[in-house]
Amino acid sequence: MRLATDQLGRPPQRVAVLSVHTSPLAQPGTGDAGGMNVYVLQSALHMARRGVEVEIFTRATTSADPPVVRVAPGVLVRNVVAGPFEGLDKYDLPTQLCAFTAGVLRAEATHEPGYYDIVHSHYWLSGQVGWLARDRWAVPLVHTAHTLAAVKNAALAEGDSPEPPLRAVGEQQVVDEADRLIVNTELEAEQLVSLHNADPSRIDVVHPGVDLDTFTPGDRAAARAALGLDPRETVVAFVGRIQPLKAPDILLRAAAKLPDVRVLVAGGPSGSGLAAPDNLVALADELGISERVTFLPPQSREDLVRVYRAADLVAVPSYSESFGLVAVEAQACGTPVVAAAVGGLPVAVRDGVTGALVDGHDVGDWAHTIDSLLSRGPATMRRAAVEHAATFSWAHTVDDLLASYGRAISDYRDRHPHADETLSRRTARRFSRRRGVRA
């Protein structure tokens, strides 16, 4: 495994990005939309600024979804019809992968053969489509898992559902088929090797980024006024999907032991926690802290900045987190973070410098750590938080992505020296079909 900036190869001109189960245009914090959506969209936008054209394929979820959305110059989102628009759970999507693949191939057929230089699939469902497209188009496949079933199942929250065996099988297939694997952290690379026997030489470490132009420090009093919060209160915020995996209940239970803390929860339901918002409201009532808990719906990026600025601390108590974009966004706004010491969070948060990491999910430990940080005065960590977040720009992420792409293209050409001949034969067949002649 290596940092992606090592040994830069020829960068691509056009990239096909696959995001089957969730659209990059969806509001993070709702449904299955979260950090991956932000990653897919922001990396595409920043690649386009480098002159790389990006087409993102995702599944249409409403009849109103247009077939094509031009997000920005050089960035296109294609909504592929595959299965019913409403009521299809993420765990039912494997039944629609053939339909999705057909839609992707039909879209590619409107271009000249060889139009895409590379395929980048996100999440295992997309990887299943990716290696079929790779074989059809004779281009390399780069895959980012974002999460792994074995890792999630090893750290299940109470009341959460385990990932099905089908996913683990599918992930193994994608790991075996992908030309390169992109991971968020060194830990994730080690997990791919130990759990899926991945070849370390095919793994690139690429840290996700944060929009440093949007997420910036600002007036805390103004942010609180906009949210209707008392400027004198101590506020600890939770941002994300309301599901057992993200563990917002841990924060509420810890807050019950801290009578001077107000909890601000910004997010919507997803995954196996579809009833979680109501359950979270009920939990606050049961704990006797309803008057100290403020619930907000999922926020736009601009509104999310106010949430981060308004908070004295942001809590990320997840049971599993491949990186933790929320933690970096909060720090970019100058707000320290208390986070679970899991997954990529020890990379996203500098323990004792920009916040604190908590081992495990014991409520007493969380209450003690939050109280300790608040007693020390979070202001002492704010400058360090901003400086740390500045190392995670999308510009850096795209530098590393393009380096990984270049290496994938170079390696693929070395392994498949006749790839151009394959494309030539496909071109001949396609033009013959258009002219009604059998090639």
UniProtKB/Swiss-Prot annotation:
Q: What class of enzyme is it?
A: transferase
Which UniProt keyword terms apply here? Glycosyltransferase, Magnesium, Metal-binding, Transferase
- Biological process terms in GO annotation: mycothiol biosynthetic process
Q: Which reaction does it catalyse?
A: 1D-myo-inositol 3-phosphate + UDP-N-acetyl-alpha-D-glucosamine = 1D-myo-inositol 2-acetamido-2-deoxy-alpha-D-glucopyranoside 3-phosphate + UDP + H(+)
**MF terms in GO:** acetylglucosaminyltransferase activity; D-inositol-3-phosphate glycosyltransferase activity; magnesium ion binding
Residues binding UDP-N-acetyl-alpha-D-glucosamine:
Q27, P28, G35, R241, K246, Q299, E321, E329
E.C. code: 2.4.1.250
List the CDD domains: GT4_sucrose_synthase
Q: This protein's superkingdom?
A: Bacteria
* Binding residues annotated for 1D-myo-inositol 3-phosphate, in chain numbering: H21, D32, A33, G34, G35, M36, N37, K90, Y123, T147, R167
- The positions annotated for binding Mg(2+) are Y308, R309, A311, T335
List the PANTHER family hit by this protein, alphabetically: D-INOSITOL 3-PHOSPHATE GLYCOSYLTRANSFERASE (PTHR12526:SF510), GLYCOSYLTRANSFERASE (PTHR12526)
According to its UniProt entry, what is the function of this protein? Catalyzes the transfer of a N-acetyl-glucosamine moiety to 1D-myo-inositol 3-phosphate to produce 1D-myo-inositol 2-acetamido-2-deoxy-glucopyranoside 3-phosphate in the mycothiol biosynthesis pathway.
Q: Supply the HAMAP family for this chain.
A: MshA
Subunit arrangement?
Answer: Homodimer.
- Protein name (record): D-inositol 3-phosphate glycosyltransferase
